[in-house]
């Protein structure tokens, strides 16, 4: 009986190693096909199964950080206080603010700031969220309290999108970002109402339609936040992916870039990476 148990354990171990090797090879093929660097952290929260690839490599996170900043503000703001007024001045407005540019010298609300940054990736809205949190000093304190000493928020929008691979500013790793995303949004730190509000925004935004959503099986529900830096072809997407009938999501972080500063990003790198990873989770 003992020999049988050991044999079964060995077979399962070999099978797991074989699957991991196959996943690695498939992701390397995506890198080679597009001459890109790919980083992945994926966690099936229903089974605790992980898929990782270059998970400790640093990438510019770009606008994907808006998911973390929005979650932090929702963490500290009760749902019945989301209509708290916030004044928008002309000096607040930065490039790419399609919503907030209509509110110059007017009041908006915390709820509207989060909607603007998550649905439309409004840069001014995210800057104002950071200010509501007490600035990056407080944001970094919160990250460290979540055991994230890797993610390095530093600059406001839009400067944070000017990625320099020689600097750690405004970068993270897929693994660090994914674990923090999971802790903040999925692990019970938000009220039920605020979590539902944020996840619904991530489902309904359209900026990620060509990214993880495109690579996911048709019957999977995807709640995502995309990001794109202005250098090194940085293109990212972070998501909670819900297989059909599942209430517990797959946490998926995909960061990509290229070696040339003026190289252009390609959404297919992200979508094809997502397809590889999610097919592995979908294998029976």
What are these regions (language model features)?
Residues 36-38, 42-58:
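Short, conserved catalytic-motif segment at the N-terminal edge
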Residues 84-99, 133-134, 160:
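Acidic helix-start/capping segments at beta-turn-to-alpha-helix junctions
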Residues 48, 59-91, 252:
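Active-site SXXK
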Residues 94-129, 136:
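Conserved catalytic neighborhood of penicillin-recognizing serine enzymes
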Residues 18-28, 32-34, 50, 132, ...:
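Structured C-terminal helix/loop/strand segments within mature extracytoplasmic catalytic/sensor domains
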């Amino acid at each position: 009986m003992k020999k049988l148990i050991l044999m079964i354990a060995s077979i399962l171990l070999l099978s797991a190693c074989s699957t991991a090797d196959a996943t690695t090879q498939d992701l390397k093929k995506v890198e080679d096909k597009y001459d890109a660097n790919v980083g992945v952290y994926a966690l099936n929260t229903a089974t605790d199964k992980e898929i990782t690839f270059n998970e400790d490599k640093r990438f510019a996170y770009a606008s994907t950080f808006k998911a973390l900043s929005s979650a932090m503000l929702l963490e500290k703001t009760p749902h019945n206080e989301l209509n708290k007024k916030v004044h928008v001045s002309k000096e607040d407005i930065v490039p790419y603010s399609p919503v907030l540019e209509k509110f110059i010298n007017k009041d908006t609300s915390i709820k509207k700031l989060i909607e603007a940054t998550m649905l439309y990736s409004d840069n001014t809205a995210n800057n104002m969220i950071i200010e509501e949190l007490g600035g990056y000093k407080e944001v970094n304190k919160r990250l460290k309290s979540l055991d994230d000493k890797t993610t390095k928020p530093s600059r406001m929008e839009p400067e944070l999108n000017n990625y320099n691979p020689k600097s750690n500013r405004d970068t993270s790793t897929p693994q660090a970002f994914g674990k923090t995303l999971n802790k903040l949004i999925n692990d019970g730190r938000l009220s039920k109402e605020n979590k539902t509000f944020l996840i619904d925004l991530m489902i309904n935004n359209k900026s990620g339609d060509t990214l993880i959503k495109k690579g996911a099986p048709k019957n999977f529900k995807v709640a995502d936040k995309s990001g794109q830096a202005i250098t090194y072809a940085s293109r990212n997407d972070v998501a909670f992916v819900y297989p059909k009938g599942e209430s517990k999501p797959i946490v998926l972080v995909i960061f990509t870039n290229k070696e040339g500063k003026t190289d252009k990003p390609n959404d297919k790198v992200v979508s094809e990476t997502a397809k590889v990873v999610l097919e592995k989770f979908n294998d029976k």
